[in-house]
């Protein structure tokens, strides 16, 4: 367990920083950079699990997720070349609740939700919202759905129209910009706005408890589909968390959203803040993020049966 390697300082650093604190101001920004080279100690502290949804052997995944009580620490810090965004567990729980509210209203109970988004905090909140409804996330391109024998999704969420599952009953487009307040431009007919249409929903959602054996995640790739149950995701997160035991923050730098979500769950299971990097982030930004947040990188683990990809 070592900090992300690299002694070199980046030549340029992000110029925009945002912090989502315990008061819900979803897009409060500041022009003051948090990247102060004079800081000698990281700001991120370990997460207290006291406010989390109580763990249950029947549905262990819910016990990992943040709640409205988790307001005193950042649970997620997002880094891209242009910005740094902090989200407390409280704010993440509100985004998840609003997302769950939209899914329940538009797609019904325990929906199958296709998520075709790049790694980022928005992709994470769509997964969290789906799991609050007791639903199942399908991640990957829409094309393998039929060939893989996977059920058609009730909803499809993407950042471009061509990535939407064409036969999904509900289609949602999410802007790529982290701080966007809505889709940029005209939406196709009957397609929902993944920010503007989410915001009116309530800040709280009573989680639907379901069995540990119920499928939580389906990975779509190469004409196949690999399922992971809610219990398997929770067990995998616990096993991965042991590789960074005692860390206050975990660096998550992976090329796809599915692995990013799994790594974030592992960080949270270990009581750490997840420091999530844009997939296109250069090495210099990764070094900056690791230094500023006191983050360590999780060692890769072999692919486990039924999980479909390494952590």
Question: Which role does the model predict for each range below?
Answer:
Residues 1-9, 56-58, 77-85, 91-95, ...:
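Long terminal accessory regions outside catalytic cores
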Residues 4-57, 143-161, 166, 305-310:
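Intrinsically disordered, low-complexity terminal tails and inter-domain linkers enriched
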Residues 5, 55-75, 206-212:
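A short N-terminal helical cap/helix-turn-helix that marks the beginning
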Residues 75-107, 210-245, 287, 300:
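Conserved AMP-binding/adenylate-forming core of the ANL superfamily
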Residues 98-99, 129, 159:
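Active-site and donor-binding regions of nucleotide-sugar-utilizing enzymes
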Residues 102-140, 243-272, 276:
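Conserved AMP-binding/adenylate-forming
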Residues 138-191, 238-249, 280-310:
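Conserved ATP-dependent adenylate/AMP-binding module captured primarily in the ANL superfamily
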Residues 167-232:
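Surface-exposed beta-loop interaction hotspot
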């Amino acid at each position: 367990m070592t900090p992300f390697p690299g002694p070199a300082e980046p030549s340029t650093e992000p110029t925009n920083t945002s912090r989502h604190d315990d008061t819900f101001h979803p897009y409060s920004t500041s022009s003051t950079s948090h990247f102060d080279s004079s800081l000698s100690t990281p700001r991120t502290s370990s997460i207290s699990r006291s406010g989390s949804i109580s763990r249950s052997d029947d549905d262990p995944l819910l016990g990992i997720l943040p709640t409205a009580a988790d307001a005193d620490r950042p649970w997620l810090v997002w880094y891209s070349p242009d910005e740094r965004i902090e989200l407390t567990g409280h704010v993440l729980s509100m985004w998840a609740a609003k997302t769950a509210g939209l899914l329940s209203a538009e797609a019904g109970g325990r929906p199958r939700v296709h998520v075709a988004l790049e790694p980022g905090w928005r992709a994470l909140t769509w997964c969290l919202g789906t799991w609050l409804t007791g639903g199942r996330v399908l991640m990957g391109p829409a094309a393998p759905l039929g060939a893989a024998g996977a059920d058609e999704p009730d909803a499809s969420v993407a950042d471009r129209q061509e990535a939407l599952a064409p036969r999904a009953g509900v289609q949602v487009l999410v802007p790529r910009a982290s701080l966007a307040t809505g889709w940029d431009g005209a939406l196709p007919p009957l397609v929902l706005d993944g920010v503007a249409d989410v915001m009116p929903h309530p800040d709280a959602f009573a989680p639907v408890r379901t069995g540990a054996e119920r499928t939580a995640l389906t990975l779509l790739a190469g004409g196949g589909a690999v399922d992971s149950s809610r219990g398997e995701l929770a067990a995998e997160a616990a096993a991965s968390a042991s590789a960074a035991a005692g860390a206050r923050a975990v660096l998550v730098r992976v090329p796809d959203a599915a692995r990013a979500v799994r790594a974030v769950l592992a960080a949270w299971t270990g009581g750490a803040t997840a420091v999530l990097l844009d997939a296109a982030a250069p090495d210099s930004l990764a070094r900056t993020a690791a230094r500023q947040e006191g983050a360590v990188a999780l060692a890769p683990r072999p692919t486990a049966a039924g999980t479909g990809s390494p952590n």
